[in-house]
Amino acid sequence: MREIVHVQVGQCGNQIGAKFWEVISHEHGVDTNGTYFGNKDNQIEKIDVYYNEVSGNRFVPRAVLVDLEPGTMDSVRASNYGRLFRPDNFVFGQSGAGNNWAKGHYTEGAELIESAMDIIRKESEQCECLQGFQIAHSLGGGTGSGMGTLLISKIREEYPDRMMCTYSVVPSPKVSDTVVEPYNCTLSIHQLVENADEVFCIDNEALYDICFRTLKLVTPSYGDLNHLVSAVMSGITCSLRFPGQLNADLRKLAVNLVPFPRLHFFMVGFAPLGSRGSQQYRSMTVNDLTQQMFDSKNMMAACDPKNGRYLTAAAYFRGKISTKEVDDQMIEIQNKQSEHFVEWIPHNIKSSVCDIPPKGMKMSAAFIGNSTSIQELFKRVGEQFQAMFRRKAFLHWYTGEGMDEMEFTEAESNMQDLVSEYQQYQDAKMDNDAFEDQDLY
């Protein structure tokens, strides 16, 4: 089987991760003790991708939980699904990273890294044919960003040919809980550009917008936000976990979505999004899903795809849907919105259909877009970074842990390069002149 080892780092990563396991356990018919209670063969057919079967017919997630302070771990352990995880797979320190990337990457995190890697090795050795790793973390804090990127580079060193995919919660323009987010985020992106294969960018502000605007929630909690993220994670991984007509795996996804190695930062979306009670009052068609999926209001990163162009995109449908219908919709959306797709990659939407819909729905779709408008996100962080770095504000916290100003400058210029690469491909046109000159002779 094509197994995936899941690693969740820091407070944000552990909360998103816990929700993800709750959602997919539900889909696979695994209860809070890891016992299978489902009644469909397809639930169990590819369950090995994410679960390990142990004695007594129990299923244990291939998950490694890492944090530099015990708080979040304790609440995961005390939650409904806390008994699901293998107790040895909780790796935690006592000191915390205090929102400091340098602590997570160089000092506190480095002390814990070996014990985390040991468990990751153990999990990987139990796989028949390891497909890759997925990391859930945030880029604004200290542990998820600093130690998360350290783990990614260590895993990369040991497993260079396996896929590395991350669900990264990026700092949002209006919702900020840490003053030093721009530093932590820039230093992390510097790492992710080099060491990750696929980065799904999620940001809290876009999630809040969806909660207010679409789900009509008055006071959304982090629980509601995590629910949205887990819906996307479940949708993206659906065709890895269930038999379907058009399957996809992490590598196929990367091959279809990454036209140039550094440009692997994706926007994600999910459809149908409706307020909790209104689901049963509407019938969805593939057309509705497609419209909603490509709508900027459904994007979980605060970037508007209309300001850029899609290099590539992927649509993962779930439910009893004919592949023909999906193909027709994809062609139609490309024709209708042709100015939002680059013309030098024809047929740039990959689609996949998985027969099993999420619980309580007839059909759903997850969307992944590689759009040049993601540069807005990097630009925003870059501007905030510059404003503080010019005055060397808060820098002593980082240099005190042994960091060098050079590292900041490097990370900043790497991010600026990334922005200009996206811009360059956004402006690139089909080169017709090359052919026209030949007529002269």
UniProtKB/Swiss-Prot annotation:
GO MF annotations, alphabetized: GTP binding; GTPase activity; metal ion binding; structural constituent of cytoskeleton
Membrane spanning residue stretches: none
Keywords (A to Z) from UniProt: GTP-binding, Magnesium, Metal-binding, Microtubule, Nucleotide-binding
Residues reported in the UniProt entry to bind GTP: 11, 69, 138, 142-144, 204, 226
Cofactor(s) of this protein: Mg(2+)
Binding site for Mg(2+): 69
Coiled-coil blocks: none
Pfam families, A to Z: Tubulin (PF00091), Tubulin_C (PF03953)
The keyword Nucleotide-binding is annotated on this UniProt entry: yes
PROSITE patterns, per database record: TUBULIN (PS00227), TUBULIN_B_AUTOREG (PS00228)
GO biological process, one term: microtubule-based process
SUPFAM superfamilies noted in UniProt: Tubulin C-terminal domain-like, Tubulin nucleotide-binding domain-like
Keyword Iron: no
Any one of the GO CC terms: microtubule
Gene3D superfamilies tied to this protein: Helix hairpin bin, Tubulin/FtsZ, C-terminal domain, Tubulin/FtsZ, GTPase domain
InterPro entries: Beta-tubulin_BS, Beta_tubulin, Tub_FtsZ_C, Tubulin, Tubulin/FtsZ-like_C, Tubulin/FtsZ_2-layer-sand-dom, Tubulin/FtsZ_GTPase_sf, Tubulin_C
Role description: Tubulin is the major constituent of microtubules, a cylinder consisting of laterally associated linear protofilaments composed of alpha- and beta-tubulin heterodimers. Microtubules grow by the addition of GTP-tubulin dimers to the microtubule end, where a stabilizing cap forms. Below the cap, tubulin dimers are in GDP-bound state, owing to GTPase activity of alpha-tubulin.
Family, per entry: Belongs to the tubulin family.
SUBUNIT field: Dimer of alpha and beta chains. A typical microtubule is a hollow water-filled tube with an outer diameter of 25 nm and an inner diameter of 15 nM. Alpha-beta heterodimers associate head-to-tail to form protofilaments running lengthwise along the microtubule wall with the beta-tubulin subunit facing the microtubule plus end conferring a structural polarity. Microtubules usually have 13 protofilaments but different protofilament numbers can be found in some organisms and specialized cells.
Protein name: Tubulin beta chain, nucleomorph
Source lineage: Eukaryota, Cryptophyceae, Pyrenomonadales, Geminigeraceae, Guillardia
